[in-house]
Amino acid sequence: MINKQRLLDEFLELVQIDSATKDERKIADALLAKFRALGITAEEDDTGDKIQGTAGNLLAVMDGGKDAPALLFCAHMDRVEPGSGIKPQIKDGIISSDGTTILAADDVAGIAAILEGLRIVKERQIPHGRIEILFTVAEEGGLYGAKMLDASKLKAKAGFFLDAGGPVGTVVVQAPAQKNFRAVIHGKAAHAGVAPENGISAIVVAAQAIAKMNLGRIDQETTANIGLIRGGEATNIIPDRVELVGEARSRSSAKLEKQVEHMEEVIRRTCSDYGVSADIKVSDSYGAFSLNQNDFVVKLACQAAEAMGLEPRLESTGGGSDANIINGYGISSVVLGMGYDHVHTTSEVMPIDQLVAAAAYVVSIIENS
C-alpha cells in the first residue's frame, strides 16, 4: 500500500533541509510546495512574526464527503542542534546521520508519514471526512508554535501527533504539566582577598539550597530539576547575585504544586539562614493531559493499529509536546510512537520499516474513522 521508495526519498530530502527552531523558513516553503502539488489548501499563520522567527505554523485542510469526525494530524518542523548539514546514511534498513549531527527523524518522520498517508488516501480514493494537517514551528524551543496558534481554525474532534518514541502502535495517552522556576538570590559583595568575611556568597547560598531540595525523580508522576546556574563576576569578588533556573513536571496538579512550593520554601529558608533575600518566579509552561481507552481518539488509534495487525500500547510519558497545548484547546489528542530511537543525539536512528508503518498508520486511522 505505502510507496516505500517515495516515502524514503521524501524523508531523506526533508532531513537535509536545515530547520532550526525559529528558522524553519526553508522547510516551510518546501512543505507549502508539496501541499500545492497534492492539491491541498494550506496557509501559514503569523506565528513567525510573534516569536521573531522566519516562518509560521502551516495549517492545511483536505475536505472529504464522508460523514465522519474531523481529524487532525500534527508534526513539528523544527529540530534540535546539531541539526544543520545532515548527511543521512542507510545501512541494514536503518537510517542514521554520519555521526556529526542528529538525524532529525524527530520530527521529519512525522511529517513524511503524514504526507505519504495523504497521498495514499488520494490515490486510492479512500472515503474520508475533514482532515486537518498542522505543521508547527518552535516545538523544541518551548511549544511556541502551538501556543501561538489560532485554535478557532481547528474543527477536529481528535488529534494525532506523530512525535513519540516507541514502536508504531504506541499511543501516548498521558503527559505531565510543567511549571518553570526561576530564583535570583541576592547576597552581599566583598573583596574576596581583603575582606571576605564582609561578604555573603550568593553562590554558597544557592549551593546549600540546591543540596536540600528533592530533585530528579520524585515519584512515578513527578520530576524536578535545576538546569541552569548563572552568577559571579570575578574570582576576587564575593558574588552578590546568582540565578537558578529549573522546572517541575507532574501528571498530578496537586503534586506539581507541592513540588514547586517545596523548591520555593527551601530557597527562602536557606536565604533566611544566611540573612539574604531571593526573588522567585514560577510560571506555567503547559498543562497536562490524561485520556483513557473510552475516549474516541484512543479508541480510533487502537482500532487503526489492530486493523494493521499491531498490538496497541497505551503509554504515559514524562515529556511535553504540542499535544499538551492542543488538548488544552479542547481537542482530545494522543501522541503516536514513530519507532525512532536515540532522538536529540548524534546516534539518532530511524528504521525504514517503522517509517513505512507510521505512514500506513495514518492511512488506517483515516480509513477507520
Q: Where in the sequence are the language-model features?
A:
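N-terminal capping segment at the start of a domain
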Residues: M1-R25, D284, D341-T345
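Short, low-order "capping/linker" segments at domain edges
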Residues: F289-A304
